[in-house]
Every structure is written in structure tokens, then in C-alpha cells.
Amino acid sequence: MTAEADTVIVGSGFAGLLLARALVAAGRSVLVLERGGLRSHAEQLRHGGHELEWRTATHSHEDGSRPYPWNYVFGVGGGSLHWTGAAPRLLPSDFTLRSDHGVGRDWPISYDDLEPFYVEAERLLRVAGDDLPLFPRSGPLPQPAHPPSPVDELAAEALEPFGALPQARPSVAVGGRPACCGNTNCALCPVDARMSMLHLLEDEHLLEHPRLELRTGVAVDRLRVGRGRVTALDCVDRRRRRSTVEASRVVLAAGGLENPAILLRSDLDGEHVGRWLFDHSHRLVHLELDRPAGSGRGATHITGASWAYADGPWRDRSGSQLVLPFNQGILGTRLVRDAIVAGDGRSRPLRERVERTLVFDVLGEDLPLPQRRIELSPRRDRLGLPRTRIHYPADSAYLEEARSRLVADLERRFARYGARVVAVERAGEGSHQLGTCFMGERDGVVDADLRHHRFENLFVVGGSAFPSYSAHHPTLTICALALRLGRDLVANS
């Protein structure tokens, strides 16, 4: 049988669609298979967003593992449909953690290898931010930084190096899309300013491209292999109807939980497939000051970032952390809860408490652990496919030590404001599913070019290919890896 396209891509998020764009631009034919549907931004607003998959039982937690709110979307656009737009690069030192500090893993590629693709990804995502010396660059960011908030200005004095957080929310209108409106609901932007892959489809008319076919409502059950190659994909649609897609080259771009699930269902369960799962630790740290902090104002919910805890000699024993001043201040749900507990007349006025509380959104790095893994469950999802069962034990001492050090140090740095830490609460975890098909020259699932170690025409792209993860949001690096893979596939075919 004849292959239906030069390349079959599984998944239509950041990685899948950026790769498809690169291939069709170079004259290659592409078939994209997407388990979910295509829902416009207007439809998302009407329905209040996309249904996150932790609500639809595609996975469960292993007995004894802590419940963890893994959230992801099946749908055209993938994670771009519900991300907040944060788009920093990794630091150069994030690629050499083991060489520099004797822990974790090095990447098989360097910052310099990825740098030109960072520039291209920033251009395509219309990233706004500062040109910070921490991140050597060969080209400027396409959009100026969002103006700093009062909280940023207060934090910058104590938390150098400090600058604007790079983010794919335009600070000025561009290409017919408005600037960020400051609504703070970035995951479902009310004016459609925050970049999504739907913008790429619309602006470049990709769905009308003669060399691109997008099939929605089609899940990949398993890969057929023979003689060191993938030969076909067995698929199932929403009505549980079966089909087979012949393939000359396959790229898995379905995310950190689905990529390994497809390999496991295909009995391609090498030593590392599905293991080394990681996500960022995410904490809101509340500091109460002796004066107003300026919370509740700013262009959007986060505009600045501190790299004071992002790198240093201590990374041999405690993880990197990215500290983001939270312009919103105390979340309304916490205020209501605490007011109910305290009772009327026994708590200070809420207005005073809000004004004097400085909140930091802190992303933390942990070391990859083999115990953190996904495997197949005997239970089935609504398409009849085995669910993934996730084992995600508690944070390691490497992360806990970093968190304790940061909390104590924040009080010291803000001592001039009479600061004391009054709360540290879990927030926003589960959106970054990384590491389950990591890249390595001799170990791992794929090599430095994202090619599977055993099958010459199988590639895995996205966060699942990360060998380690630092404290930085992964999206821009996912995009850069996809663009680099696109260059390589065009050059070698």
C-alpha cells in the first residue's frame, strides 16, 4: 500500500502544527491526526473553554500515588488553547546540569544549537519582552515588553536580576490582532490576543494548503512496525470505527502523556518509555508587608520575572526557581475562605490585607525520577483505548531544599518592608507533562535529532523529549525543537 503523505504527524498542538507548517512550506505532504475536534475561539468563549482531559477520564492515578491535576486538551491547537502565554527560553546552563553540577542530565544539544530556532519561535509567537543578557540572542524579540506593574517595581529592587517575563501576549496590536487587554484571564483570552495555534492556521491559511490534510476526531491506537521502521498507524474515531493509515515517516507530537501511551500500546516499551515524567512545582508565596504592595494593578496577571534563584553553584543540591510577581495579589477564593474562618470582627479589613500582601508565583525544578511514570491501565477510555495510569510520588529533597531556602530568603530580601511569609500554597500544577520519551545520545528514547533509537522513520517531539527541565516554562523550547526537527526532515528527505 502507498503512504498517504510524506509525513504523518500525531497531534496538532505547538509542536505538531509548527512542524507541519515547515514541511508543507518546503514542498512536502503532511497528514495530521488529531484526537479532538476543531473549535474556534468564539466557540471556546461561548462554552467557557475546552474540556480539560483530567475531567474526561483518559488517565487515572496508581494506588498510593498522590492525586495530581494533570490537565491537557484534545483538540486542534492542543496546549495553545489554554496556556497563559509565558514564553521564556531555557538558560544556557540548563542544558549542562550534569556537567556543571553532577546531578540530573545534560541535553544532547546545546543552547547554541537551539538559539536560531528560539529566534524563529519568538517571531512566530509574537513574543513580547526584554533582551536580557542572561539569554544570549542573535535576533531581537518582535514585541516590546509589557510595562512593569507596581508589584514588579517593588520586587525588582530586591530580586535582581529582574526583567519582563517573555510572553506571547502582544503589547501592541499586530497583524489584525489586538494588544493584551489586561483582563488577567489569559488561558481564555476574551479578545483573542494571546497567541494560539489557531492564529497560525488562520493567518497562514494552512487548512487550505493543498499539501496539508488535517483529520480530527481520530486517535492513534498503536503503531505497526517491521524491519526497523514504522509501516502504519492503527486508528479509532469517536464512534469507535477502526482505520489504518500507511506511513513512510511518523512524528509523535501528542504531548507528554499521549506520546508514551501510543508507544506502550504498540509494545514499544523500552526501558525509558513513560518513565521520568516531570512537571514544574508551582507555589504561591504570600508575603505580608508593613505598607501597600501595589497589588491589583498592571497590564496583566504577570508581567515581570526574577532570575535571582534560577542558577548558581547550589544547583548541585537544590533546584532552580523562577519567581514571578503576581499582579493580582491574593486570589479571591483565599480571601473568602480566610474571612469565613476568621469570622466578622476578628480579622483586619480585607482591603488592608490585600493592599499589604505581595504574592509570588514560583516555578520550581526537580530532578527527573524513574518512579514518576505512566503505564497502561486495564481500564478503558471512551474510545475503548487503555487509559494511562500515572504514578507521581512526592517532591524530592532537591526541590524541597530549594523551596525552603527561597521562603527564608524572601523574608530577608524584603526585610526593609517588614515582610513575613504568611502562606505557601500549591497552585496551577499539572500543565507541563515532560520527560516521558527523553532525548539522549546513548540512553533515552530518541537521539539528539529526536529520532527513535530503534526505528529510523519514527520521531518524537514536544515536552516528552526533554531530558531535564529547569524552572522555565517549556513552550518556547517545544516550539524551537519542532522548528529544528522541521529543518532536519526537509534537509534529509
Model-identified regions with their sequence ranges:
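N-terminal Rossmann-like FAD-binding beta1-loop-alpha1 element of flavoenzymes
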Residues: 7-32
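Residue-level detector of alpha-helix initiation sites
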Residues: 13-14, 150, 257, 465
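Mid-to-C-terminal "cap/lid" subdomains and adjacent gly/pro-rich loops that border
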Residues: 22, 248-361
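Glycine-rich loop(s) and the adjacent beta-strand/alpha-helix scaffold that form part
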Residues: 25, 29, 36-41, 223, ...
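Short hydrophobic beta-strand that contains or immediately precedes a catalytic carboxylate
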Residues: 32, 214-215, 460-461
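Redox-cofactor-proximal catalytic regions of oxidoreductases
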Residues: 51-134, 370
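Conserved redox-cofactor binding core of oxidoreductases
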Residues: 100-219
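A glycine-rich dinucleotide-binding beta-alpha-beta segment and adjacent secondary-structure elements
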Residues: 179-189, 221-226, 356-364, 386-469, ...
